[in-house]
């Protein structure tokens, strides 16, 4: 299941169940088209969309795929292809890393996400 690829080993079981249940509730015909289209949009438009941004941008990064295509948590100072793309095309972005969570930090670490957003907004 594709959504399971967004989780890491340390993702709490209730979060894992919620993510999988939500993905399974999506009609198969929609899900089969959705992921390839999202990936294609990113490949075709992400760099230009990032470069066109003229507003403050907060990016919260938590995971990446390792060489074995397994999603793993990242640590502050780690470099990923996505972070390199952000630095190249949106050098004004504020990049924050939340460790030890999967692709859904708003579910796994809501207090940490909220603090980062509050601090970002306070600096505007």
Model-derived features: where do they sit?
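Acidic-enriched, low-complexity/disordered segments with a strong bias for Aspartate over Glutamate
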Residues: 42, 68, 78-79, 111, ...
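Alpha-helix boundary/capping detector
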Residues: 45-49, 61-64, 112, 121
């Amino acid at each position: 299941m594709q959504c399971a690829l967004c989780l890491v080993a340390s993702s709490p079981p209730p979060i894992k169940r919620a993510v999988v249940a939500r993905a399974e509730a999506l009609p198969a015909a929609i899900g089969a088209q959705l992921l390839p289209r999202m990936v294609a949009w990113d490949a075709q438009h992400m760099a230009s969309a990032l470069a066109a941004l003229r507003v403050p941008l907060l990016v919260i990064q938590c995971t990446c795929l390792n060489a074995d295509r397994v999603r793993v948590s990242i640590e502050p100072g780690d470099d990923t292809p996505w972070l390199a793309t952000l630095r190249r095309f949106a050098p004004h972005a504020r990049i924050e890393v939340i460790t030890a969570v999967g692709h859904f930090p708003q579910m796994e670490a809501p207090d940490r996400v909220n603090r980062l957003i509050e601090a970002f907004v306070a600096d505007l």
